[in-house]
A protein has these predicted regions:
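Bacterial N-terminal signal peptides
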Residues: 9-18
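Short sequence/structural segments immediately N-terminal
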Residues: 22-304
Length: 304
């Protein structure tokens, strides 16, 4: 725990030291000086509680994981000051301190450095190159600290937290066909790592297909006859977050199929027959039922 506290203060000091003077710099300069002096309260959290006990939001920390009396909690070390910085000379609202949220004098990167000094396991190793970090999203943009249950860690509340920013994805999951997120059978984190990953779109797996195969294993193969678009990317045909078409398809069959298979005639279609996609009554899947791949003797026709 001592090493974690040292890491927190070291990271914050480095970030603060890079701040240039200018508008709003004075509080940060004062805060950096407090870190350099390292004057922490002699009574720890007891000093803070003397005034802040009137605030339910502050006292709720003791119902959260951060307020538990164990070796992994800030309460085992510098307590409140482990996150909020040294407050040995705290004189009320005018005294600069490490705070979190939009009203904080610290940038999102500085705020996050306090959290990542302790929360630095392998699931967060790609945070600094993640889209969230690049967009200056802070940890508290998603997480709530002084609460018994952080909503983002509760399965049936996670989707709502993500949807506050990802509005288009929320709209998609209410379309005709979608993954069962709105019923609580899935969450966004089943496919995505919000803390970043080495894959596109912060996927948990190496690519789109491997992510899909985690649930749709029957589509993985290997197949004797493979369908190239399927093996390349499931997203060639499907909208993962939802679609107005059945089976999450980007467009209806046969229009979807015709994007690759040009309308230049088809075996078994008599000359003069109506070959229109819209009015010809074409149904590709009537014959080509194993479109994800097949081991059937019919070969690349992908039949049953």
């Amino acid at each position: 725990m001592t090493m974690k506290i040292f890491n927190v203060m070291s990271v914050v000091l480095v970030l603060l030291s890079g701040i240039s003077t200018g508008v709003g710099a004075d509080p940060l300069d004062t805060l950096m000086k407090k870190f350099e002096e390292g004057k922490y309260s002699k009574k720890g959290a007891d000093t803070c509680i003397m005034c802040h006990k009137r605030s339910d939001k502050v006292m709720a920390i003791f119902d959260s994981v951060h307020g538990q009396a164990n070796s992994k909690s800030p309460m085992a070390g510098l307590q409140c000051e482990a996150c909020h910085g040294p407050q040995g000379k705290h004189k009320g609202k005018n005294e600069p301190m490490v705070t979190f949220g939009e009203s904080s004098p610290l940038t999102a990167e500085m705020q996050n450095s306090v959290c990542t000094a302790c929360h630095n396991d392998t699931s967060r190793v790609a945070w600094h190159t993640s889209l969230h970090a690049e967009q200056d999203v802070s940890c508290v943009s998603c997480h709530q600290l002084h609460v018994t249950k952080d909503p983002v860690l509760v399965k049936d509340q996670l989707v709502e937290v993500c949807s506050e920013c990802h509005i288009s994805a929320k709209a998609d999951m209410n379309k005709r066909s979608s993954h069962p997120l709105k019923w609580g059978d899935m969450t966004c984190s089943d496919c995505h790592n919000p803390h970043g990953s080495m894959s596109d779109s912060a996927l948990n797996e190496i690519d789109v297909n491997q992510t899909c195969f985690e649930c749709h294993a029957e589509k993985r193969g290997p197949f004797l006859w493979e369908h190239a678009p399927v093996m390349e990317n499931c997203a060639n045909c499907h909208d993962a977050h939802g679609s107005v078409n059945e089976a999450l398809l980007k467009s209806r069959v046969p229009m979807l199929c015709k994007q690759c298979h040009a309308n230049d005639g088809h075996a078994g279609t008599a000359p003069g027959d109506n070959s229109s996609i819209q009015t010809g009554g074409q149904g590709c899947l009537n014959c080509h039922g194993q479109i994800h791949g097949s081991n059937h003797p019919s070969g690349k026709a992908f039949q049953f």
